């Protein structure tokens, strides 16, 4: 059986990913929306994406950023950072539009709750 290595294709693919991340990290801060979520994500298994505050569009519904970074914080440190293109996050959030909760100070922020496990359901997210 002949073994052929596709290292050159893998290398090119990997470098493409490196370039995309490098471009993102060098992006203008106004192009990136960053939200930090404390232990709540760990307790519930959901991330909360803000869409309204005091009845007005906010968060995902108001952002002009190209990218959304959702930091999952636990026990005084960042556990991980989830990076999304804003249009992709809007597409995901729309699936859960009926799963909202009022949270924050005086319960003034309306958030869409997205189950973390659903973010990684490749069959659901990627059309093969």
What is each PLM-predicted segment?
Residues 26-29, 64-67, 85-89:
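Short, solvent-exposed coil/turn segments at beta-strand boundaries
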């Amino acid at each position: 059986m002949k073994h052929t290595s596709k290292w050159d294709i893998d290398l090119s693919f990997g470098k493409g990913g490196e370039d995309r991340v490098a471009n993102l990290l060098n992006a203008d801060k106004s192009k990136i929306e960053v939200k930090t979520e404390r232990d709540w994500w760990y307790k519930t298994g959901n991330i909360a994406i803000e869409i309204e505050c005091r009845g007005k569009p906010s968060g995902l519904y108001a952002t002009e950023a190209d990218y959304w970074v959702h930091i999952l914080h636990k026990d005084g440190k960042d556990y991980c950072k989830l990076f999304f293109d804003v249009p992709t996050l809007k597409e995901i959030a729309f699936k859960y539009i009926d799963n909202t909760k009022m949270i924050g100070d005086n319960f003034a922020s309306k958030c869409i709750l997205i189950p973390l496990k659903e973010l990684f359901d490749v069959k659901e997210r990627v059309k093969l």
